[in-house]
Structure formats: C-alpha cells, structure tokens
Amino acid sequence: GKPTTMTSEQLETLLRNTPVNRVEKAEVMYSAPPELHVRGAVINVVIKRSHDYSFQGELSTNYQNRYFSSGGANGNFRFSTPKITLDVMYGADNIKTMEYTDLLSRHTLNNNVYEIMQNEKLSSKSWMHNVRTALEYNFNEKNHLNVAYTGSFTPDGHNRSIADGSFQQSNLDKFTDNKMNNITVQYSSGIGLEVGGDYTRYTSDNSQTMFTQLSDKSKNSYTLTGGQRIDRYSIYADQKHNLTNNWGIGYGISYRYAKDYDFQTYDNVSGNIKPENTEAGLNEQTTGFYFSLNKNWATGTSFSISATGEYYTIGNYHKWAVYPQASLTYLKGPQHIFQLSLSTDKSYPGYWDMQSSVTYLNGYSELQGTPGLRPMTNYNLNGTYILKQKYIFGLFYTHTSDYFAQTPYQATDRLALIYKNTNWNYMRMIGANVILPLSMGNWYDARLTLVGMQARQKCDCFFDVPFDRKKWLFIGTLDNSFKVGKNLSFELIGNIQTPFIQGTLDLASSFNLTAGMKWNFAKDRCSLTARCSDISNSSMPDMKVRFKEQYLDMDSGAYTRTVSLNFTYRFGGYKKQKVKGVDISRFGH
C-alpha cells in the first residue's frame, strides 16, 4: 500500500466496508519495513485493481454538535478502465468550535504570592475545502504510474479569545487564510523498482488585534500581521528482490528538502508590552538510505530486519542517525503465535515552534518559540503472544530521547504565564497490555483492552525547575457491538484512565462513554450513522501544577460532549480506498 494519515477509526471503517473479494492482502506489521516510508506499527491493506469498465461514486453529508453546530458534505467519484483509473474528490466543511478554560494561578513573584483567577472563552469558525484528483495508468499488470493532486483551503478563519478575571480583561481576534497544494508522482515497475516524489506548497496569512485592561486600570493593545511560506520537496527510490527459498532483500534512498519563511510584525503597540518583530527562514534537509532482509517459512514463521541511515540538517544543527527495525513472528501452531519487534520513529516540531518569537494570547498568557528545538527519536520494543488467534497479551518498552512538549510555566521576573515547547532528556515507558474478545451468538461482540504502564519523564533544562518524575498509568476500554438483524447495529464504548503526568503538570483521571448506531438500507447503497461521544462530559482531565513554587489549576472540560450524524449514499459498488494523505502537522502559526 501507500502511506496514509487516516486515524485508526477511519481505517477500521475502511476495513469493515471493503468486501473480502476486493482485498488482495492485509498485513499487520508491528515494525514496518523501510520501503513503506513510515516507522512503527502499521496495517498494510492492498486492494485488487479493477480490470473492467465502471463508474462508481459516493455522496455523504455530516452534522456535528459540540456547543456549536458544524457540518459538511463530501463527494467521491471513480472512473475505471483496464488501463486507467481516475479518482475525483471534493469536500466542504463548515467548522465552529467553542472551549472554556478556568484558570487559577498562585504566582510567586519577588517573595509575594499573587492569586490570579481567569475564565477564557475560545471560539473559532471557518470553512474548509478539500479537493483531490488521482490518475493511475497501468502499462501492464506489473507497471503502474500514479499522479495525484491534493488541495486544502481555509480562506476565512476567525478565532476569538475573551478572557475575564481578577488580573486582566482581554479580547483577541485572529483572522487566518491558509492554502495547501500538493502533487505526488509514483511509478511501480515489474522488477521491484519503485520511484516517486512530491511537492507541497503551503501559505498562511493571519492578522490579530488584542486589547487588554489590567486590574490597575493600565491598558495594553497591539495589531499584528503574520504569515508563513513553505516549499517542501521529496524524492525516493526503492528496490526489492525476491530470492530463492522465500528470502528477500530491499534497499533504497530518499531525500527531502523544506524551505520555511516566517514573519510576524507588530503595529499600533501601546502599554507595558515590548513585542519584537520576527522575520526568519529555515532550510531543512533529510537524506536517508536503507537496507532490509526478510525470510518467510512455509510454517508461517517469518522475520525481517533493516537499518536506515539518516543525515539531518537544519540551520547549524547536523546529525547522523541510524534507525534499526526488526520483527520476528513464530508460529508454534495455529493456536499459539509469538511476535517480537523493534521499531524506531522520529517526530519533528513545527517550523513556527523553532522560531524566536513571542505571541501574546491575552494580558497574562504568552506563547514563546524555541530556537534550536530538536526532533524527538522514539525506540519501541514489543513482545506479543496471541492465543487461539484472538486473545492478545503484550509487553512493551518505549524510550523517547529529546522528547518535546508544551508545558505552562509561571515566569519569575513578571506576572506572565509562558507556554513553550522544550526538549526533555527523555520520556520512558514500560508496561503490559491485554486484549480479550467476547461474543454471544451472532448478536453480540465485545473487546476488552487493559493497559498498565509506568512512565518516567526527565528534563534538566525546563526553565529553573528541572524535573525527574515517575507515574503509573492504567487504561481500560470496553467496546461493545450489538447486531439487530443484518442491517442495524449499535455500539457502546467505555474508556477510563487513571491520573497521569506531563512534565510538571498533573492530569486527573478521565472517563469517556460513547454510544452509536449504524443502519444500512437500500441494498447497502445507503447508510446512516449516529453517535454521541463523551456522554458524561468527563473525557478532558483537570490539570494542575504543584511543583516547587509553581502553582496552577486549569479546567478545559466545560463542554466536550459531541453528537454527530452521517449519511452516505454509494452507487456503482463504490468502496472508499485508502489513499496517501499530505502531512501538514508541522505547518501553521
């Protein structure tokens, strides 16, 4: 298959809606081979190609209510011949959100303690337009060319923050205009060679206006104009060889270049704030190469091992790294399967997060950039035992070096709450998980998932409050499915999580109860889905800081209950395909 950015829920929907005769193979990989250009655990689904003439499509509409009502519509169409497959997709969504945050800060400054109480209302509204066109040309059974264009546009975004409290009252309005265009080309040959590349252009423009009145009647205000321009290129080449006795080798190279330009200009500044304008660029290059070896036995036992070398540079930061991947599956028999895997992963901070910038969120809170913020590297070791092909017992160990996260900090030189991404020494987790399926006849299926682990988080350079903390975490999830006839089903999902930590933050326990139904009708051409998630409005944990002289309470769970409806109509036997998504996680201000 191809890389995707689909969530696990979307992937589950895809698998349930795809008939068995359309699937060529489905593989669960706890340690993905490097030629997939993703790291960690993946599900690789390969769909059979069409060999006839057809026109298929899907029309859908959705509604969601979480304080505000949102909704959208989407259309997917596919035209297929033995040589050509053309996919066209367009979707439009009207998005409205609302969040409330209650804050209590006992801020120590010059040996005095200031109690600051604040309520902040955050709202946003926008129209998002997504378009995708993909053309696949089959030269023959084994040689294929794919060209795809993906666009995403949010032209009139409006975010508003209204804060009211004992220290300050403020009003901030932010208007945004974001555009993303991507084109991808991929060629697969019958000799095991695959080459490809893509280009992404992202532009973002925003303007802000903030007005603040402090408790001493002094006033601060500013207007701001900012933006981001990103050009990103990537190319790769992979080669696979199938050898005798079910041995296989693979090797490949890849190169990615990204050029980022950010600017932020303040104007009409008044009061006791001293903002600085930002105008900076980043040039990032990543060069990788890998070699892999795999073997399959007739008994079902298999193993694979690979190593990926990477040279990464951004600004004055240069680093060589090697990322090992290994997996072993041993079948003692169909009733007993043992799996062992080692995987590595790397996550990068957003480009704007790496700039030297300060953005004032209200009269008390500010967001600071972190020049020199490094990518985090994650190492995972997993051992799994599968009993009777359904009961799963696992052990895992995870070590993440240079882990970064955004944690609030009460400044020691002024009354300001700072949000800033910081690299930690590491985050380490060790634990176990159990998955137990349950069923009664053909009408009831359930899956109980239990996870227990201990986390250790260490950072020697978090402002003037270094930390080294440990915490046990337990998670339990029960997923129930009830079938009423062939076309109607209900689900009830409960999830509970014990208290946890994030840096200096303490996170309270949380609970999420979700109920839903799905009805297929009109000979499976139509489906109606209804769902209510977080029925008890308790999925967002309360947060607090009680660390050295830092004292902070935050509650952002005022309204998290979500009701959603989705209607889908398909014609021509259309089944939604898994497609490559464009990663824009590092874009935006």
Predicted regions: what is each one?
Residues 282, 346-395, 399-401, 417-431, ...:
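Outer-membrane beta-barrel signature, preferentially recognizing the C-terminal barrel domain
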Residues 40, 99-112, 152, 157-173, ...:
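Outer-membrane beta-barrel translocator domains and adjoining extracellular loop/strand segments
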Residues 84, 128-154, 173-324, 331-335, ...:
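Face-selective signature of the C-terminal outer-membrane beta-barrel domain
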Residues 4-31:
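Short acidic/polar hinge/loop motifs at secondary-structure boundaries
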